[in-house]
């Protein structure tokens, strides 16, 4: 008695080989950068001004978006764009309308745009 079997075999494909040079590394925030951003974020959440955030890692930049409510457009975006590091600075804070509020080489300096300024109060 001879049995015939229909075997189907799967072919494994290494996606890294297929993508090859087309898969460029993505830009992301390192641990220290993310820590600095989250310190400012935590302070503003405690003050009741911000409620949510999102992190996007793209090929040319990393974006930390800040929301009052998640269903809205972001109030601010903290962006890291390495290709601008030698020109205008890798870090920037962008307002909802697209206005660049602060740009620079040092993330801590750029994040100071969120510090509340002291105001003189008349008696």
Can you annotate each of these PLM segments?
Residues 2-3, 11, 117:
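Long, non-catalytic architectural segments outside compact domain cores
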Residues 7-63:
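Negatively charged, low-complexity tracts enriched in Asp/Glu with abundant Ser/Thr
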Residues 13, 78-98:
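Short aromatic-glycine-(Arg/Gly/Cys) micro-motifs in beta-strand/loop hairpins
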Residues 47, 72-73:
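Amphipathic alpha-helical interaction surfaces
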Residues 53-63, 67-72, 85-86, 96-97, ...:
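Basic nucleic-acid-binding interfaces
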Residues 74-82, 100-107:
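Short amphipathic beta-strand/extended segments with alternating polar/hydrophobic composition
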Residues 92-121:
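Mixed-charge, glycine-accented linear interaction segment located at domain edges/termini
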């Amino acid at each position: 008695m001879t049995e015939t079997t229909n075997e189907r075999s799967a072919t494994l494909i290494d996606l890294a080989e297929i993508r090859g040079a087309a898969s460029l590394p993505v830009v992301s925030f390192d641990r220290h950068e993310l820590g600095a951003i989250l310190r400012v974020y935590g302070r503003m959440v405690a003050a009741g001004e911000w409620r949510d955030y999102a992190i996007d890692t793209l090929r040319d930049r990393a974006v930390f978006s800040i929301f009052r409510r998640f269903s809205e457009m972001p109030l601010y975006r903290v962006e890291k764009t390495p290709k601008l590091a030698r020109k205008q600075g890798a870090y920037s804070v962008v307002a909802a309308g697209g206005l660049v509020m602060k740009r620079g080489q040092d993330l801590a300096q750029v994040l100071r745009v969120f510090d509340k300024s002291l105001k003189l109060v008349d008696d």
